[in-house]
């Protein structure tokens, strides 16, 4: 792939005019050496390790941002799933651990900390259940702690007992946090990845080093402008434009990641290629799809356009870096994408269409606000549907859904900042309560048997 002089100028304009940024430098920290039978000692150990390993992260990001002229929007921490780390305490609540994570993250100045998590794709240990039941109070009493639950995988199937509990947990969190905001910090996964730098689903996987740097880039506005200014006629040419643009975006992220690793003396892990939108005008994944030829995101052809975008981003990014990982694709969070917001408000982008789109993009149903009266079993049904797509197709899928207490279809909710605002979207009539209450496990599909 040859690089022309005008493309170098385009790279400069990416930052100046097109909202390009490095969305996050995330340091993953292993907490296994913090384990103790005493929960107070565990909390002290966790605080000490996070504040020691992560103490220079924010300063390093600021130095690199000034040096290269590229905004680095967030600095974050991910930790080993707390359900594993706190198990030895035999405590009946892990809220104090969440509060320790919150204090430690604030002490070093990072934006978010992830890893208040449980991996329950095949079954729940007592510690896993304690953690999940602690999530509502943890989200209520902390500010920047993020939580995730992995309830299924292609190799294990879907743990429907965990799906039921996850729905109840989200509903409870919505009831006790203002406008359900706590739910914006909870993700339910199928096939969760261990090196995700993005929140709210980041955790530090069991196969990772003691500490590692993972970087997430963001450039929907860059891709849209490249398409708008190109002479691409066919979709083949559109894919080529996206691929070349993703290459340039990825090279910047790779540079930042490698430099951060040197300065912090922490190994560089992965670069996540995901196009992560913001509520800002000109920073929208939906608008990219519309630039390809759709009148509005959500109309017929949207899933195909998104598949093209996702694949071209991966191809361009893989050529630019040997460290591609995480989720790497295109995010479609409704409240964080002004184009998605507009399409949802018009009624054209629906929950059903979003579910179809998740079969071909990076993650899943993300930052979707639903009526506060939505029952827990409906939330569980939505999670199960999304998990089934991930399980059968061997990809990561997820649900981050916010039942907004006291609000109904036709209203909207304001989250602020990068989380934006969202119209309340309708859910289906009818009930899946009997199905969800059956529990058990949806067996792993035939394609899980690969050995």
Swiss-Prot record:
Taxon lineage: Bacteria, Pseudomonadati, Pseudomonadota, Gammaproteobacteria, Pasteurellales
Similarity remark: Belongs to the UPF0210 family.
PANTHER family hit by this protein: UPF0210 PROTEIN MJ1665, UPF0210 PROTEIN SPR0218
Signal peptide: none
Organism encoding this protein: Actinobacillus succinogenes (strain ATCC 55618 / DSM 22257 / CCUG 43843 / 130Z)
Entries under InterPro entries matching the protein: UPF0210
Name of this chain's protein: UPF0210 protein Asuc_1169
Subunit (UniProt): Homodimer.
């Amino acid at each position: 792939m040859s690089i022309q002089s005008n493309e170098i100028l385009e790279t400069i304009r990416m930052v100046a005019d097109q909202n390009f940024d490095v969305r996050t430098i995330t340091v993953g920290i292993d907490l296994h050496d913090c384990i103790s039978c005493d929960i107070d000692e565990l909390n002290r150990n966790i605080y000490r390790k996070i504040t020691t390993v992560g103490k220079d992260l924010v300063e390093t990001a600021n130095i690199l941002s000034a040096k290269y002229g590229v905004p680095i929007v967030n600095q974050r921490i991910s930790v080993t799933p707390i359900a594993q780390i706190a198990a030895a305490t035999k405590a009946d609540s892990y809220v104090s651990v969440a509060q320790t994570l919150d204090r430690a993250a604030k002490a070093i100045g990072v934006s978010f900390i992830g890893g208040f998590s449980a991996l329950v794709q095949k079954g729940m240990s007592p510690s896993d259940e304690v953690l999940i039941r602690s999530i509502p109070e943890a989200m209520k009493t902390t500010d920047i702690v993020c939580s995730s639950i992995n309830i299924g995988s292609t190799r294990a199937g879907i743990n429907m007992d965990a799906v039921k509990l996850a729905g109840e947990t989200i509903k409870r969190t919505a009831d006790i946090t203002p406008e359900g905001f706590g739910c914006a910090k909870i993700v339910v996964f199928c096939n969760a990845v261990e090196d995700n730098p993005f929140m709210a689903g980041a955790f530090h996987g069991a196969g990772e080093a003691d500490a590692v740097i993972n970087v997430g880039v963001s450039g929907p506005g860059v891709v849209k402008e490249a398409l708008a200014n190109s002479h691409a006629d066919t979709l083949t040419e559109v894919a080529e434009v996206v691929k070349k643009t993703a290459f340039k975006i990825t090279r910047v992220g790779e540079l930042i990641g490698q430099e951060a690793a040197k300065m912090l003396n922490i190994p560089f892990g992965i670069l996540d290629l995901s196009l992560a939108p913001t509520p800002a005008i000109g920073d929208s994944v939906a608008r990219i799809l519309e630039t390809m030829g759709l009148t509005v995101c959500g109309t017929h052809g949207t899933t195909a356009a998104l598949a093209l975008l996702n694949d071209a981003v991966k191809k361009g990014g893989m050529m630019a870096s040997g460290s591609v990982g995480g989720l790497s694709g295109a995010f479609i969070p409704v409240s964080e994408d002004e184009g998605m917001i507009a399409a949802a408000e018009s009624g054209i982008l629906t929950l059903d269409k979003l579910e179809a789109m998740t079969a071909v993009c990076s993650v899943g149903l993300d930052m979707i606000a639903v009526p506060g009266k939505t029952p827990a079993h409906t939330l569980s049904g939505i999670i199960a549907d999304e998990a089934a797509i991930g399980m059968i197709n061997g990809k990561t899928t997820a649900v981050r859904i916010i039942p907004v207490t006291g609000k109904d279809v036709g209203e909207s909710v304001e989250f602020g900042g990068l989380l934006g605002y969202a119209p309340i979207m309708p859910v289906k009539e009818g009930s899946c309560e009997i199905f969800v209450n059956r529990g058990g496990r949806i067996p792993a599909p035939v394609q899980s048997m690969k050995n």
